[in-house]
UniProtKB/Swiss-Prot annotation:
Family statement drawn from the similarity comment of this UniProt entry: Belongs to the ATPase B chain family.
InterPro entries to which the protein is assigned, alphabetical: ATP_synth_B-like_membr_sf (IPR028987), ATP_synth_b/b'su_bac/chlpt (IPR002146), ATP_synth_F0_bsu_bac (IPR005864), ATP_synthase_B_chain (IPR050059)
Quaternary structure annotation from Swiss-Prot or TrEMBL: F-type ATPases have 2 components, F(1) - the catalytic core - and F(0) - the membrane proton channel. F(1) has five subunits: alpha(3), beta(3), gamma(1), delta(1), epsilon(1). F(0) has three main subunits: a(1), b(2) and c(10-14). The alpha and beta chains form an alternating ring which encloses part of the gamma chain. F(1) is attached to F(0) by a central stalk formed by the gamma and epsilon chains, while a peripheral stalk is formed by the delta and b chains.
Higher taxonomy: Bacteria, Bacillati, Bacillota, Bacilli, Lactobacillales
GO MF annotations in UniProt: proton-transporting ATP synthase activity, rotational mechanism; proton-transporting ATPase activity, rotational mechanism
Alphabetically ordered keywords of this record: ATP synthesis, Cell membrane, CF(0), Hydrogen ion transport, Ion transport, Membrane, Transmembrane, Transmembrane helix, Transport
Pfam families hit by this protein: ATP-synt_B
First-listed, main subcellular location of the protein, grouped into a coarse class: membrane
Gene3D superfamilies per UniProt: 6.10.250.1580
Name of the protein: ATP synthase subunit b
NAD among keywords: no
Annotated Gene Ontology cellular component terms: plasma membrane; proton-transporting ATP synthase complex
Membrane-topology descriptor: Single-pass membrane protein
Function comment: F(1)F(0) ATP synthase produces ATP from ADP in the presence of a proton or sodium gradient. F-type ATPases consist of two structural domains, F(1) containing the extramembraneous catalytic core and F(0) containing the membrane proton channel, linked together by a central stalk and a peripheral stalk. During catalysis, ATP synthesis in the catalytic domain of F(1) is coupled via a rotary mechanism of the central stalk subunits to proton translocation.
């Protein structure tokens, strides 16, 4: 009996302690929930929101950077194309100007050549006309002198030589 009474007392002691521990644990949980759990969950939620915002901002920044890089690449390609067109147009313009200059130079050279030919022809005509006039004048002078006097063969030769010398001096 003694053993039974000790066991009964010890069971009630354990049950009382157990109830005390359970009540204390529940009170402790309520205090933790009220003072620690809510602020910790709020802090974790704020941190999760901040991380999500940072990820979204990073994604937007990356997309913006990709768009800007694509835009710069397109502008660079456009600039290269414009530069190639400018160079091509400059080459075409240079070739056109070169062809015009060559054509003008050829026309000018042809005109100068024709003018030189005309001048040479005119000079030849003038020389022929002058020679004809000189020969005619000389013939008239010779004929008039022959008529005025009859010459011997030596006198005739001397007269002709003097007129030829005069003609040569006259042309010089």
């Amino acid at each position: 009996m003694f053993v039974n009474s000790v066991l009964a007392e010890s069971n009630s002691l354990y049950i009382g302690d157990l109830v005390f521990y359970i009540v204390t644990f529940i009170i402790l949980m309520l205090l933790v929930k009220h003072f620690a759990w809510k602020p910790v969950t709020d802090m974790m939620k704020k941190r999760a929101d901040k991380i999500a915002n940072d990820i979204d901002n990073a994604a937007r920044s990356r997309e913006s950077a990709e768009k800007m890089a694509a835009k710069r690449q397109a502008e660079l390609q456009s600039s290269r194309q414009e530069a190639a067109e400018i160079v091509s147009n400059a080459k075409k313009s240079g070739e056109t100007q070169r062809a015009q200059i060559v054509e003008t130079a050829q026309k000018d050279a042809q005109a100068l050549k024709q003018q030189a030919q005309k001048d040479a022809e005119q000079a030849r005509r003038d020389a022929l006309n002058s020679a004809k006039d000189d020969v005619a004048n000389l013939s008239i002078e010779i004929a008039s002198k022959l008529i005025q006097k009859e010459l011997k063969a030596d006198d005739q030769k001397e007269l002709i030589d003097s007129y030829i010398e005069g003609l040569v001096e006259h042309e010089s």
